[in-house]
Amino acid sequence: MAESIRVLLSEEEVDKRIQEIGEEISRDYAGRKVHLVCVLKGGSFFMCELAKRITIPVSLDFMSVSSYGGDTKSSGVVKIVKDLDESLKDKDVIVVEDIVDSGRTLSYLLEMLRDRGPASLRLCTLLDKPDRRVVDVDVHYTGFQIPDEFVVGYGLDYDQMYRNLPYIGVVEFDN
């Protein structure tokens, strides 16, 4: 089965929206330091660009949580692959994610991080698929709401491919 990619959000659209989110976070946390927690691998492209656009002090940490196999649907099974290196105690934490889909993974992750005692905990996602939501998740900063299509680019992959695309594209499968 071959696939092709159709552009959903251009590089320019994505870049402009990330700038706006960076400005919003800078205003919301003015006078404070924010601790960004990147959910790897997909969130890395978004977090790197976002961090450059935040004008207040920022610290970074990374974790890897898996709920996808080689398929196009979330498996619903959450596994922590890499945990954080730093404590979240008393920090203003923003979890940076590439996409919110069913909400299962992030619900689990946010509950786990909440138990670590941050001063505040918010979620920032580049993409949100509200039509796929199974578990309610409070997203504080959203880049784009998108339809229920399988997307790649800007860190999102299909079977480890297409992460490097500078735009968000829809995978279209040839039958």
Language model regions located:
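PRPP-associated nucleotide enzymes
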Residues: 1-175
